[in-house]
UniProtKB/Swiss-Prot annotation:
This is Carbamate kinase. The keyword Phosphoprotein does not apply. The gene is arcC. One of its GO terms (biological process) is arginine deiminase pathway. The keyword Amino-acid biosynthesis does not apply.
């Protein structure tokens, strides 16, 4: 049985609980179809829009005397539970329809990062809602947040995105998998924690979910990491007249494309970097990057970008 880790993009999950629940129902059908085909599946997901909205809402309430402000690690934990619950419910319902007897568990996951990671001095991870340039400038002036333009879609707040070095609950994830459980873990890249004198402490950051998914997939010795995003392929010369979709490519070819500056820092670059990190740790594995809608065809080799050693 092939083991795969599927990383869902947070932006593909919608902007509200109602929209997300409807989208997740379709996602569940696609994921359960993998189980029907005989794959052993582990699920991770992004949380960029969701954790940003949670943080924004709670801080707005605090500023208006309606409750305390919440630190980012707690907001990350809330987003893991919120997204995980909706995935869990939809997956269980779809499994029930198909008479598949399988438990689904969302595991709130901490991921260790280095306290001296240079990312803390250079925020790059987009979170939350999209703003106009004027809105972003006003919020920067009022709150001191850093904003960047995100792939032509508007401006988003950015926070530090340190490298994941250790998944704290890895043993628990492996135990659940061995017992046949469908596991949702490392949501949003995991809650970032640093280790101080043997104790863990949460820090204000968002770990890139694809890089944590790559680390998880490598530890689990997965046959494949699937990164689901908004596009059907990885492209070079994206948005230009000579735009080109990448089909099956090697690690060396992707490294050359990175050197040529082909991938945007806030969107496709971390996905490609995560793919290469997984293959570096697990040379026999491969990475498939495509959209959720095209997943079935991508697994049949008809579409999507497949990266191999």
């Amino acid at each position: 049985m092939s083991k795969i880790v599927v990383a869902l993009g947070g932006n593909a999950l919608g902007q509200s609980p109602e929209e997300q629940l409807e989208l997740v129902k379709g996602t569940a059908k696609s994921l359960v179809s993998l189980i029907q085909k005989g794959y052993e599946v582990v699920i991770s997901h992004g949380n960029g829009p969701q954790v940003g909205s949670i943080n924004l809402g709670l801080n707005y309430a605090a500023e208006n005397g309606q409750g305390p402000a919440f630190p980012f690690p707690e907001c990350g934990a809330m987003s893991q539970a919120y997204i995980g619950y909706q995935l869990q419910e939809s997956l269980l319902n779809e499994l029930h329809v198909l008479n598949i007897d399988k438990q689904v568990v969302t595991l709130v996951t901490q991921v260790e990062v280095a306290g001296d990671d240079q990312a803390f001095n250079n925020p790059t991870k987009p979170i939350g809602l999209f703003y106009t340039k004027e809105q972003a400038e006003q919020t920067m002036e009022e709150k001191g947040y850093k904003f960047v333009e995100d792939s032509g879609r508007g401006y988003r707040r950015v926070v530090p995105s340190p490298m994941p070095i250790n998944i704290v609950e890895l043993d628990s994830i492996e135990t659940l998998i061995k017992h046949g459980t469908l596991v949702i873990a490392a949501g949003g890249g995991g809650i970032p924690v640093v280790k101080e004198e043997g104790n863990y402490k949460g820090v204000d950051a968002v770990i890139d979910k694809d890089k944590t998914s790559a680390l998880l997939a490598a530890h689990l010795k997965s046959d494949q990491l699937i990164i689901l995003t908004a596009v059907d392929y990885v492209y070079i010369n994206y948005g230009k007249d000579n735009q080109e979709a990448l089909g099956e490519v090697t690690v060396d070819e992707m490294n050359q494309h990175i050197a040529d500056g082909q991938f945007a820092k806030g969107s496709m670059l971390p996905k490609v970097e995560a793919a290469l990190q997984f293959i570096e740790k697990n040379p026999e594995g491969s990475v498939l990057i495509t959209s959720l809608e095209d997943l079935g065809d991508a697994l049949d080799g008809k579409i999507g970008t497949l990266i191999k050693k």
